[in-house]
Each structure stands twice: as structure tokens, then as C-alpha cells.
């Protein structure tokens, strides 16, 4: 009997989390082996490790507690990897040497796969004097371009895809350039960007007051605060960036306000961190804790089980601090000094649906607040008991801690316990993006987001090269089907497309009240929302206590979300209508950089005395590696003319960008009337098919397409089923139109790809 609620869950486990040897030999035979591996590794610091291993295994079993993907993939593997998802890097000095020292640290961190966040407000503005060199400063945006190039280079070397967050204060003299930087579609593609909005700035926006842009006490320019706010809003309305972070609120509510100042976040925004701070993340799966789902007057979330699970999860995550490696020693020291963790939730929308409550309603906000308050109380209680057993975090100061942040709203029983025993972890709660692990857990709703699609189809590549369609159903919807058969879904089953923006904000605000760190959430707004109404969303987020706001409005720039009727392709994949004999260009060809990286493959065709040497060079576009050109060389002059023609044609197709995987399919479909050959135990029908196989292997190796089981980049006409949902943009990993903005990250519901990792 499988533990997986859906085939996609098992495939994601196999692809991302299952332990395998370097040669591909499977070491985790079952998902139980994966759970046991994690439990054993995280129980090692305990005096009674065997007993705690069993408790940790019980928490992991059936996907009740979901550690972040880094922990699932890396714990107990003996590999030199970090178990932390992301980092905020050190403060950037305003000097050339200091700036490039920070670039080196960023490269070393990203090389190990960690996403990074930086505040670029510390770099002097463009045009400022540079003493001693008789020159003007180039400004922080120019150095962000260097960081962006570094990220592309790290990815082109085969490392995990990069994610970076850049922040800038709302009073920095270069803030106007920062706001509009991503209106250039080719610039800063590897960055998420957010403006640090201070409380005085927000008050000046309300009163239409003036606003000074300053650096080191010097006023460079004065603008109207409302005009600057409108520029931020217009850029976000049109390009989905920059986001807005209410930085004074973050610092005022920080448990560690007495010993640190925060000016940056991790790439997805749920962890505001000090210099060298690190994200340690895990999620309670609320959907697994609902008893008597869909039974009127009986369905409820078992809060006693929740308390026990939270206590175990806190202990597990605390042990990760000691078990993990870190890219930099400064990161290890920061983690050890404060031992902050980010315990959150996933499956909230599913749990609400299972107890009969409509996501976004006042009742949903009330329940969300209640459940997260319960989690916070259980987490702080567990951490206090851990402190009594193992010691408080080194920078703990009882009076200062109890007067700060989350402690101001905590009940007296917990406060007294902390004063008596101390507390092991400085901060404990955070709502992180959970797109991939939520699919791993059976496609539960992600984080505190609404259900995005009740059901959809994806295409899966089979061993014989054919593709099958597979329905992927939301966890709660599938449970409804299992219990109620064909009965229609009740009205309280809503999705992200049917919710008003104020419903999203209401839920985020309800959650933020009980979360000591921050929340990664996307507020989906309709394409036709007016600019004034759009601005109101951000002001509502500020007024209701949110620590930040991220929206997604589909449009021609960000990627439209299109309705698809039965049997009809999305408009953007239909053939163009050609009037008369006009030539229609699919896309402008990409310019060739001066130098490209690639691979050369040797193919020995049995019917030829001489081998073919196939060179495929790649280019990085929008943070994604893709084939750009092909060359074929051989001593066999019989092949010369057609190989030149073939490679010129294939290269011309590649340079147009987009989905070029059809080249593989067309080549592999060619049969030679003289017969094919057996190569590596497989029949290949022609030398052209062999070339197609090489190109396919290369595309898989660079991550342009997926291998067997996870779907080739293919026919985009995947239909959304049941609730007439709408497909999203094309996924850069699997090519299916199931890429959506969820929790501040572009996440694919077909293969689990997430920009945030």
C-alpha cells in the first residue's frame, strides 16, 4: 500500500528527496526509509537518541510534519550540504573592496545552493563623489547587475538555481531607479526586489507630505511621498515588482530588537533576518490533523494533536541548527547565537474546507488566528522547556526579550515559564513557501494560500516515449470525492481566482498577528483591477498589521492567466493568422554572446567508419539555461552537406528561444530506409534519431526538459478540469502551463518547480 496520496507526490519524492548513490543506485527504498533517515539524523544530538528517533519518525509519518526540502533531501546523507534554505548576507560596505568581498561571500553561499538576501541601501548613490579617484559613484544598481551576473554564472556551472532578494530603503537617493529597474525585461532577472517602506514614509504618503532622499545625512533630492508611492505602485501594477516590506514594523515586533537591526529578507520574504541570518523552515500539515472531515457539527482540527506535533517539530528543528553545515563561518555563528527557527503551516485552505469554512471569510480569519495562536503558544512552551533542558540561546536577556516582539501578546503562563527557564530559540514561527513539499504531501493547499486549482491535468513522459495525461486533484477535493462520490463540491470550496483581494489581505493579517517572523503570500488580483483599487490593497495590508505585501496581476508582461474551453488551446499557443503572403516571426532571434558554454558529445554510428562530434552550446535567459546552437563535425565527408544544413536550421530554431523540444521529437521520428542500428542496447532508427537522442540527453542534463516520469516540454494544451480553473504560464522546468504565483514564488503544480527552491 502506497503512502502517497497522488502519483505526482511519489514522483517528486523520487526526483527531489529520495536518497540515491552517485551512480543512481536507490538507497531510500521507500518513503519510510526517507522518514527514518531524517529522524535518525536529527535525533543524534539527543541523549536518548533511539526514543527521539521514534518520536521524530512519528511526526514525519503520513506527512504530518514537513521539514523544508533541504532537510528532507540532505539530513542523514553524510553529504557536505547545508540544511538551511536561504540566508541574508552581511552588510555591504560602501567601498570597492568591501563590495567585492560581499560578492565573494554571495557566490560561495549560492554555490552550496542557498538563496540570499541583500540590502543595497548601504552603497552610495549614483553620481556621488568617490574620494581619491576623481570619479563619480556608479550607484547600487550597477553593483546589483554584477550580483545578477554572478548568479547566472553559478547556475551555468550546474549549481542549484539561484534566488536573490534585493532591498532598498524608501529614502535612498537611487530608489526611483530601483523601482523601475525591472521594467527592462533583460535586467536583474535573478532578483526579487522589495522597497523598505518606513512608518514615516507611509504617514507622509497619507498626508501627501514631502520626502527627502538622503545618504549619510546628505539630502540629494526632495520628492512628494505620494508621488514616490505611486511610482512604486505603478511598477508593481505593471511588472509585479517591487514588493513592499514594512521594515519599521518588522524591527518593532522583532523578539531580538534589543540586539539586532533587520534591513533585508530571504528571497521569498517570510524571514526578515539580520546580517548572516539563516532560514530554518518546516511546516505543520493542518490538513492531516482534521478529524471527521466534511461532517457537519463534527469536523474539527484536533488541537491536542497539534500541540504534541508542534512540540516535537520544535525539537527537531532546533537539532538542525547543530546538524547542519554552513557556507560561511559567520552564518554558523549567527545561527548558534540565536537559534531562530521558522515553524509554519501548510494545508490551511484544505483544513478550512474540511471543517466547512470558506477561505477568506471572517470565520476563516478567526479560525486561522486561533490555530496559529495555538501553534505559537505550543512552540514557545516547547522552546522554554528545551531551554530548561539544554540551555537558552546565548544572547537571551530575560527582561529585554519579554518586553519585545511576540512576547507582548503572549499569555502570562508562557511568559512566566520563559522567565523561569529561558527560551531555546529566539524566534519560532514563519509561513514559508511550501509549493514543492505540499505536492510531496499529496497536493495539499500551499502554506496559507487558498486552493489554487481544484484539479488539473499534466502530461507525463512514459518509458516508450509516449505521453499520458494524469489528473492532479487538490487533497481536500480528493477527500471529498472519496467520501461523497460524485456529489458537487459545497459552496465553501473557493479558489484563488474567485477571491476578492480583501479576502487575501484578511487572511494574511489574521495569520501575521500570530507569527513572530513574517509570511510569504501572494495576493492575486484580477487583470482588470483599477490602479486606485490596486493601491488600496497595499494600504489595507499596511493598516491591518501585515509586515509586507506581494501581489500578482496577470497581464502581458507578467504572464496572463487564460481561460481555456474544452479542446481549445490557449491563445498564445495557437498558430498566427497570416494575411496574404506576409511572413510572421515567432520571436526575434537571440543575440549571440561572445563566449558560450557547452558540451561536445561523441556518437559512433555503426555504419560509418568515423564518429560524429556534436557540440551543443547554451545560453542563460531569464535565469534559465537553454540550448542556443549546434555544430556537428566528422571526418566522413559524406555527411558534410546535410550536417551543415541541419545544424544551421536547428541553431536558427534554438536562437528563437521558447519551447524547442519538438526538435528532439522530429529527429527521433526519422527512420532510415536502409535500416537503423543498435546503440547501447537500444534500437535507433537512423543517424538523425541518434543526433536527436544526444540533443535530448543534453536538454535533460541542463534542466531544460525533464526525464522520464516528470513530463517532457510538450504540447501546452493541458486542460484544467472540474471547476473550470485557468492555466498559468509555461513552466521553465517541464513546459506545462501550470506555473502560478503562490506565496511570492512562481511555482509549478505539475513538476514542483519553484523559483524559490
Regions from the PLM with identified roles:
Residues 75-83, 87, 95-119, 167-169, ...:
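Conserved phosphate/anionic-ligand binding catalytic regions in large, soluble enzymes, centered on
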Residues 415-417, 564-613, 718-727:
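Short, Gly/Pro- and small/polar-rich lid/capping loops
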Residues 197, 256-263, 267-272, 341, ...:
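Terminal amphipathic helices with adjacent charged low-complexity linkers/tails
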Residues 59-76, 170, 314-322, 334-356:
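Core structural elements
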Residues 1-83, 229-233, 539, 543, ...:
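Acidic/polar, glycine-rich intrinsically disordered N-terminal extensions of enzymes
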Residues 3, 84-303, 326-333, 379, ...:
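Active-site cavity-forming subdomains of large catalytic enzyme subunits
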Residues 270-272, 317-322, 404-405, 417-424, ...:
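Catalytic alpha/beta core of large soluble enzyme barrels
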Residues 216-218, 309-332, 336, 340, ...:
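Internal maturation/activation junctions in enzymes
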Amino acid at each position: 500500500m502506497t503512502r502517497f496520496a497522488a502519483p505526482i507526490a511519489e514522483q517528486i519524492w523520487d526526483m527531489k528527496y529520495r536518497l540515491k548513490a552517485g551512480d543512481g543506485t536507490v538507497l531510500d527504498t521507500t518513503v519510510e526509509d526517507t522518514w527514518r533517515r531524517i529522524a535518525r539524523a536529527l535525533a543524534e544530538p539527543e541523549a536518548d537518541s533511539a526514543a527521539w528517533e521514534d518520536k521524530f519518525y512519528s511526526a514525519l509519518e503520513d506527512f504530518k510534519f514537513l521539514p523544508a526540502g533541504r532537510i528532507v533531501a540532505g539530513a542523514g546523507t553524510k553529504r557536505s550540504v547545508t540544511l538551511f534554505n536561504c540566508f541574508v548576507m552581511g552588510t555591504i560596505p560602501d567601498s570597492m573592496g568591501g563590495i567585492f568581498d560581499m560578492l565573494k561571500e554571495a557566490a560561495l553561499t549560492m554555490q552550496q545552493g542557498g538563496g540570499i538576501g541583500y540590502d543595497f541601501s548601504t552603497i552610495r548613490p549614483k553620481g556621488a563623489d568617490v574620494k581619491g579617484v576623481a570619479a563619480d559613484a556608479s550607484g547600487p544598481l550597477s553593483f546589483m547587475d554584477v550580483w545578477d551576473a554572478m548568479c547566472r554564472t553559478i547556475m551555468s556551472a550546474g549549481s542549484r538555481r539561484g534566488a536573490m532578494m534585493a532591498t532598498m530603503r524608501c529614502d535612498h537617493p537611487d530608489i526611483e531607479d530601483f523601482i523601475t529597474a525591472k521594467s527592462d525585461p533583460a535586467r536583474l532577472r535573478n532578483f526579487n526586489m522589495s522597497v523598505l517602506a518606513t512608518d514615516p514614509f507611509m504617514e507622509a504618503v497619507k498626508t501627501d507630505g514631502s520626502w527627502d532622499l538622503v545618504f549619510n545625512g546628505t539630502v540629494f533630492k526632495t520628492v512628494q511621498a505620494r508621488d514616490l508611492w505611486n511610482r512604486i505602485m505603478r511598477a508593481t501594477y505593471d511588472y509585479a515588482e517591487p514588493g513592499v516590506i514594512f521594515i519599521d514594523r518588522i524591527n518593532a515586533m522583532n523578539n531580538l530588537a534589543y540586539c539586532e537591526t533587520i534591513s533585508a529578507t530571504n528571497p521569498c520574504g517570510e524571514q526578515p533576518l539580520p546580517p548572516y541570518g539563516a532560514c530554518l523552515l518546516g511546516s505543520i500539515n493542518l490538513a492531516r490533523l482534521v478529524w471527521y472531515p466534511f461532517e457537519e457539527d463534527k469536523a474539527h482540527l484536533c488541537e491536542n494533536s497539534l500541540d504534541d506535533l508542534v512540540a516535537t517539530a520544535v525539537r527537531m528543528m532546533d537539532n538542525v541548527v547543530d546538524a547542519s553545515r554552513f557556507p560561511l563561518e559567520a552564518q554558523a555563528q549567527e545561527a548558534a547565537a540565536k537559534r531562530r527557527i521558522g515553524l509554519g503551516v501548510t494545508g490551511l485552505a484544505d483544513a478550512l474546507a474540511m471543517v466547512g469554512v470558506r477561505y477568506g471569510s471572517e470565520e476563516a480569519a478567526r479560525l486561522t488566528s486561533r490555530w496559529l495562536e495555538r501553534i505559537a503558544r505550543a512552540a514557545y512552551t516547547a522552546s522554554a522547556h528545551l531551554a530548561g533542558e539544554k540551555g537558552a540561546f546565548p544572547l537571551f536577556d530575560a527582561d529585554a526579550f519579554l518586553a519585545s516582539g511576540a512576547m507582548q501578546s503572549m499569555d502570562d503562563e508562557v511568559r512566566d515559564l520563559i522567565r523561569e527557564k529561558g527560551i531555546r530559540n529566539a524566534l519560532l514561527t514563519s509561513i514559508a513557501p511550501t509549493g514543492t513539499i505540499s505536492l510531496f504531501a499529496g497536493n495539499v493547499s500551499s502554506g496559507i494560500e487558498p486552493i489554487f486549482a481544484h484539479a488539473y491535468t499534466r502530461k507525463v513522459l512514459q518509458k516508450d516515449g509516449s505521453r499520458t495525461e494524469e489528473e492532479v486533484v487538490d487533497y481536500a477535493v480528493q477527500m471529498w470525492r472519496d467520501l461523497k462520490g460524485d456529489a458537487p463540491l459545497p459552496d465553501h470550496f473557493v479558489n484563488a481566482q474567485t477571491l476578492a483581494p480583501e479576502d487575501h489581505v484578511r487572511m494574511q493579517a489574521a495569520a501575521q498577528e500570530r507569527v513572530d517572523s513574517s509570511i510569504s503570500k501572494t495576493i492575486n488580483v484580477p487583470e482588470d483591477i483599477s490602479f486606485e483599487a490596486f493601491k488600496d490593497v497595499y494600504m489595507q495590508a499596511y493598516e491591518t498589521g501585515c509586515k509586507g505585501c506581494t501581489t500578482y496581476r496577470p497581464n502581458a508582461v507578467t504572464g496572463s492567466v487564460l481561460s481555456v474551453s474544452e479542446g481549445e488551446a490557449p491563445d498564445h499557443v495557437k498558430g498566427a493568422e497570416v494575411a496574404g503572403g506576409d511572413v510572421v516571426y515567432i520571436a526575434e532571434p537571440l543575440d549571440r554572446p561572445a563566449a558560450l558554454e557547452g558540451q561536445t558529445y561523441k556518437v559512433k554510428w555503426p555504419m560509418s567508419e568515423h564518429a560524429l562530434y556534436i557540440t551543443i552550446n547554451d545560453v542563460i535567459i531569464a535565469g534559465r539555461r537553454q540550448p542556443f546552437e549546434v555544430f556537428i563535425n566528422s571526418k566522413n565527408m559524406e555527411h558534410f552537406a546535410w550536417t551543415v544544413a541541419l545544424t544551421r536550421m536547428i541553431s536558427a530554431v534554438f536562437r528563437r528561444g521558447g519551447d524547442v523540444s519538438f526538435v528532439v521529437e522530429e529527429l527521433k521520428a526519422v527512420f532510415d530506409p536502409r535500416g537503423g542500428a543498435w546503440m547501447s542496447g537500444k534500437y535507433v532508427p537512423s543517424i538523425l534519431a541518434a543526433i536527436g537522442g544526444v540533443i535530448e540527453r543534453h536538454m535533460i542534463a541542463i534542466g531544460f526538459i525533464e526525464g522520464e516520469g516528470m513530463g517532457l516540454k510538450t504540447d501546452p494544451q493541458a486542460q484544467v478540469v472540474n471547476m473550470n480553473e485557468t492555466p498559468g504560464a509555461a513552466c521553465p522546468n517541464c513546459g506545462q502551463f501550470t506555473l502560478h504565483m503562490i506565496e511570492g514564488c512562481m511555482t509549478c503544480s505539475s513538476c514542483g518547480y519553484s523559483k524559490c527552491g
